């Protein structure tokens, strides 16, 4: 029979493991166990008060399964951090975490990955590694380029009102607009969407004419809207 010393106390018998003390400053963790999300969804940790020791908070966020998943931390506010995996989560899997000393988990669905190719004027969607649809698209014009990088679906709106004043363009400016837009899939909080744009169908596949959004035909936008969910990745490449 083994004797194990833990924190100054002595336990006799099987090896004892100290129960982790939960971080009471953690208010919520997303995704929750009840959610099935896309393979690019970040882990979002909200704290009750602003975090002064960010390094300690980051150390308390650990991926248990799958093993060897690494990522980066993005503090979007003094009390909210996003853990963004370097690689996409495995599809159709349970992801297990430790956050603030407490176990958490969520599930991923299919791997629905969209690639917007700015120079090829295409928007290609693969589901579980198989190309499901390649669509002609129009991205941001030179003055309003679509940002390059990997993004995730933040929400869906059908319809949504898009107003150029929210990005600093007055309505009476030649570039001004206020439009009701269908099948809008948000990929940045700054206002970049993938959406239906019947007015630019003639340019889709040939030229980039938008104010930064990814324009699709109504039919293609509806298909994407109906096949995409929160956390699905959108990769914009030059």
What label would you give each PLM region?
Residues 110-113, 141-148, 164-238:
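Exported/periplasmic cell-wall-interacting domains
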Residues 54-56, 123-125, 146, 160-164, ...:
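Short, solvent-exposed loop/turn elements at domain surfaces
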Residues 123, 153, 185:
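Conserved hydrophobic/aromatic pocket- or pore-lining residues that grip, position, or stack substrates
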Residues 1-8, 12-112:
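Acidic, low-complexity Ser/Thr/Gly/Pro-rich repeat segments typical of extracellular/periplasmic
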């Amino acid at each position: 029979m083994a004797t194990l010393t833990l924190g100054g106390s002595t336990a006799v018998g099987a090896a004892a493991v100290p129960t982790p003390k939960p971080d009471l400053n953690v208010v919520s963790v997303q995704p929750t166990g009840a959610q099935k999300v896309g393979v690019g969804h970040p882990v979002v940790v909200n704290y009750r008060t602003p975090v002064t020791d960010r390094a300690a908070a980051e150390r308390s966020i650990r991926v248990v399964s799958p093993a060897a998943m690494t990522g980066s931390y993005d503090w979007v506010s003094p009390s909210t951090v996003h853990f963004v995996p370097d690689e996409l989560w495995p599809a159709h899997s349970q992801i297990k975490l430790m956050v603030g000393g407490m176990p958490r988990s969520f599930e991923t669905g299919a791997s629905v990955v969209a690639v917007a190719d700015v120079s090829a004027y295409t928007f290609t969607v693969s589901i579980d590694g198989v190309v499901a649809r390649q669509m002609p698209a129009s991205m941001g014009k030179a003055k309003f380029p679509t940002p390059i990088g990997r993004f995730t679906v933040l929400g869906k709106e059908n319809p949504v009102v898009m107003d150029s004043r929210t990005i600093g363009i007055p309505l009476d400016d030649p570039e001004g607009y206020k439009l009701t837009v269908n099948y809008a899939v948000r990929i940045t909080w700054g206002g970049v969407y993938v959406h239906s744009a019947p007015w630019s169908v003639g340019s889709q596949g040939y030229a980039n004419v938008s104010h930064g959004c990814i324009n699709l035909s109504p039919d293609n936008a509806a298909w994407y809207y109906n096949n995409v969910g929160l956390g699905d990745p959108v990769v914009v490449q030059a």
